[in-house]
Structures are given as structure tokens and as C-alpha cells.
Amino acid sequence: MHIVEGHIEAKSAKVAIVVSRFNSFVVESLLSGAIDTLKRFGQVSEDNITVVRVPGAFELPLAAKKVAASGKFDGIIALGAVIRGGTPHFDFVAGECNKGLAQVSLEFNTPVSFGVLTTDTIEQAIERSGTKAGNKGGEAALGLLEMVNVLNAIDKEL
């Protein structure tokens, strides 16, 4: 049996982090967690990390698509926070963001890690951005590092 796996270390990986400015009090913590994880666990050089800021989560897929189309990056991390309010706006933004980012990944054969919080409350968002429930930005970075490596391994081994 042949097993193909990805590892976390990716010293030469070029990573773009596409970040929503909306709900920045949460998203900046996600960004810090992602960058810290890329550097500490992936040993990615700061020179190989590019941050692209967009207004909100709805704009993340288009920016990620443009980044992927450039061919300059091994992977993309999308970070944002969509917090439920009193209208259906949450459902539209969260759903389209998710679908759009998945489409970018499949269209360009580039891993796009989903670090967009979709929570019912501000408290839940804060918990997931570095307090009680860990830092989902860091988790998204770990997932991206593994996917970059597993895709490279598939190319080499299969």
C-alpha cells in the first residue's frame, strides 16, 4: 500500500493571506495566529508571506481568485469573521464566501484554507480568535501547510 501525506514544514512555500477588514477586532487576531503558525511550524520566511486586505468576507473570493491567477503563490489563507445579526445577510455572505473560496481552489489547483469565522455571537468569534477555542487563523495556516505539501507529494509520487 502506498500512502501519500503532507507534512507541516514548508520553508520555501509562498503564501498569500487574504484578510477581511470587517470585524477587524477579531480578524487581526486570526491574522496574527496565521502568521505565527506559518513562521513557527512551517518555517516559512516572512519574505514569502503576502497579506492582501479586502473590505469584507464577501470580497475574499475575488481577491483570492486574482491571487491564485497570478501563479506566484503555493497557497492562500482566507481570513474573516461573519457574525450573525438580525437579518438573513449573514447566510448570504457566509455561504457565498465559502462557495467562492472553494471554487477558487478547484479552478486553480491551489489550496485555499478557509479561516473565516461564521458565528452566532461576538463572544463566539472572540473565543475562536485566540482565547478559549484556540485560534482558527493558526489552524487555517496548519491546514494550508499540509495541503501545499500533500499536493506536491501527489505530483512527485503518483
Curated annotation (Swiss-Prot):
5-amino-6-(D-ribitylamino)uracil binds at F22, A57, F58, E59, A81, V82, I83, F114. GO terms for biological process: riboflavin biosynthetic process. It catalyses: (2S)-2-hydroxy-3-oxobutyl phosphate + 5-amino-6-(D-ribitylamino)uracil = 6,7-dimethyl-8-(1-D-ribityl)lumazine + phosphate + 2 H2O + H(+). One of its GO terms (molecular function) is 6,7-dimethyl-8-ribityllumazine synthase activity. It comes from Shewanella amazonensis (strain ATCC BAA-1098 / SB2B). Catalyzes the formation of 6,7-dimethyl-8-ribityllumazine by condensation of 5-amino-6-(D-ribitylamino)uracil with 3,4-dihydroxy-2-butanone 4-phosphate. This is the penultimate step in the biosynthesis of riboflavin. This is 6,7-dimethyl-8-ribityllumazine synthase. It is an enzyme of class 2 (transferase). Keywords: Riboflavin biosynthesis, Transferase. Belongs to the DMRL synthase family. The keyword Glycosyltransferase does not apply. InterPro entries: LS, LS/RS, LS/RS_sf. The active site is at H89. Pathway: Cofactor biosynthesis; riboflavin biosynthesis; riboflavin from 2-hydroxy-3-oxobutyl phosphate and 5-amino-6-(D-ribitylamino)uracil: step 1/2. It holds the Pfam family DMRL_synthase. (2S)-2-hydroxy-3-oxobutyl phosphate binds at G86, T87, R128. Forms an icosahedral capsid composed of 60 subunits, arranged as a dodecamer of pentamers. Its EC number is 2.5.1.78. It comes from the Bacteria.
